């Protein structure tokens, strides 16, 4: 039996006391306890807790069965204020990209992120559509609230910085206003605004140089046609060609494309504004000034109708039938249907002074001559002449005002002849 020092014996006694007071912890529990103590030291020092120390604690909280322990531990260990059990992720180191159903990415997340390297920035580039190569040049205009600048090219930054550093007070250069600018022949005149961030040693802000010039493009390969530009005082600086030597064909094409597109939009708006009856949307289709399909001074798209048979009468029954006769010259209907329905608008007024007397205004003008045998002493035959007999008014309740005048006269004349026969029968010999 080995002899132990009094100090070692005292330590063993203390260990036995601790064993009796506290139960033994497992190896995993002891490791977790040490990690928690290390996390506490980070928090006490005011430093950010490393990710590899927090993840095992999250896993242990998720696998734990005690809800109270989960609640208190999550509220203590989370520096973002996580107080609910549902917010805890069962696999915090796994990427959260899913398809909305069962699939989930199995890659490991990045440090302090929720997604892996593959799915980290997914979907950001979909917000802008890639139309043409020129749209990429024009897309940077919205970033600085100006048209496209040359800030992407490193050479332009070096040249601009070397030129502007000489005179820091000159912030805006307008070449068109300077007397030294010379002109060229057959040149398009666009405008260009160049936005550039200068070095912090010169200026901490942004210097905008608006350049509107007369002669920008003669050909695609042509150089700048602007003379020497004095920036301040009597000093002479390099020309615009040396100012921006890296102006490429791509930039020139972008400027020309923007100018042509603007002119095209202006031309279309003028066409719509000045549109009249004879100038419509569809070329080759012109409307008559008197047509009902077109109103003067405005163009209605729903009023445009194409007639397959322009020379045919347009009278229809509203379904399938249509008149087959030819129209009159300069009209839409034939001679039969031209004035149909016009008399219905003005009904004939038959009321006059003869209605009060009960007699018809019509009088039989024809002389009715008949030979009536009369018996007298001499057995002579006398001829009786009946002329201008005023006929009583015959009212036909069934007749309407739309009937023609000829029909009314005929009906009245027929009824008048019947009355004449009754009147002449009085002179017959049998009476």
UniProtKB/Swiss-Prot annotation:
Gene Ontology MF: a single term: ATP binding
Keyword Transcription regulation recorded: yes
PROSITE patterns for the chain: QLQ (PS51666), WRC (PS51667)
Chief location bin: nucleus
Keywords: Activator, Nucleus, Repeat, Transcription, Transcription regulation
Domain called QLQ: residue spans: 24-59
Induction behaviour: microRNA 396 (miR396a or miR396b) negatively regulates growth-regulating factors (GRF1-4 and GRF7-9).
Tissues with expression: Detected in the shoot apical meristem (SAM) and in young leaf primordium.
Domains: entry comment: The QLQ domain and WRC domain may be involved in protein-protein interaction and DNA-binding, respectively.
The name this protein goes by in its record: Growth-regulating factor 9
Species: Arabidopsis thaliana (Mouse-ear cress)
Lineage: Eukaryota, Viridiplantae, Streptophyta, Embryophyta, Tracheophyta
């Amino acid at each position: 039996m080995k002899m132990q020092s009094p100090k070692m014996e005292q330590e063993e006694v203390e260990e036995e006391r601790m064993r009796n007071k506290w139960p033994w912890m497992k190896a995993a529990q002891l490791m977790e306890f040490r990690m928690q103590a290390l996390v506490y030291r980070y928090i006490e020092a005011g430093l950010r807790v490393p990710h590899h120390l927090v993840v095992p604690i999250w896993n242990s909280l998720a696998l734990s069965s005690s809800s109270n322990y989960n609640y208190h531990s999550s509220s203590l260990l989370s520096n973002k204020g996580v107080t609910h059990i549902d917010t805890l992720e069962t696999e915090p180191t796994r990427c959260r990209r899913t398809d909305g159903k069962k699939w989930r990415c199995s890659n490991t997340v990045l440090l302090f992120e929720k997604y892996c390297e593959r799915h980290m920035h997914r979907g950001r580039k979909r917000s802008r559509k890639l139309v043409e190569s020129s749209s990429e040049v024009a897309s940077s205009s919205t970033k600085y609230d100006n048209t496209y600048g040359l800030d992407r090219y490193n050479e332009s930054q070096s040249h601009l910085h070397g030129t502007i550093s000489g005179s820091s007070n000159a912030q805006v250069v307008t070449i068109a206003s300077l007397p030294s600018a010379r002109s060229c022949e057959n040149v398009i005149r666009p405008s260009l605004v160049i936005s550039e961030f200068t070095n912090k040693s010169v200026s901490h802000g942004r210097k905008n140089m608006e350049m509107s010039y007369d002669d920008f493009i003669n050909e695609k390969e042509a150089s700048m046609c602007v003379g020497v530009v004095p920036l301040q005082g009597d000093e002479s600086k390099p020309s615009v060609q040396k100012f921006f030597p890296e102006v490429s064909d791509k930039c020139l094409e972008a400027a020309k494309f923007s100018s042509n597109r603007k002119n095209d939009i202006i031309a279309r708006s003028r066409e719509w504004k000045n549109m009249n009856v004879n100038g419509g949307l569809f070329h080759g289709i012109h409307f008559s000034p008197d047509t009902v399909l077109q109103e003067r001074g405005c163009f209605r798209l729903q009023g445009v109708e194409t007639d397959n048979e322009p020379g045919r009468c347009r009278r229809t029954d509203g379904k399938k039938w249509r008149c087959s006769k030819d129209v009159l010259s300069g009209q839409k209907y034939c001679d039969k249907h031209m004035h149909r329905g016009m008399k219905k608008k003005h009904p004939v007024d038959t009321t006059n002074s003869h209605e009060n007397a009960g007699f018809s205004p019509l009088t039989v003008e024809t002389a009715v001559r008949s030979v009536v045998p009369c018996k007298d002493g001499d057995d002579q035959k006398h001829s009786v002449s009946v002329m201008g007999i005023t006929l009583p008014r015959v009212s036909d309740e069934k007749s309407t005002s739309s009937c023609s005048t000829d029909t009314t006269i005929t009906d009245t004349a027929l009824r008048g002849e019947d009355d004449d026969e009754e009147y002449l029968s009085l002179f017959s010999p049998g009476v």
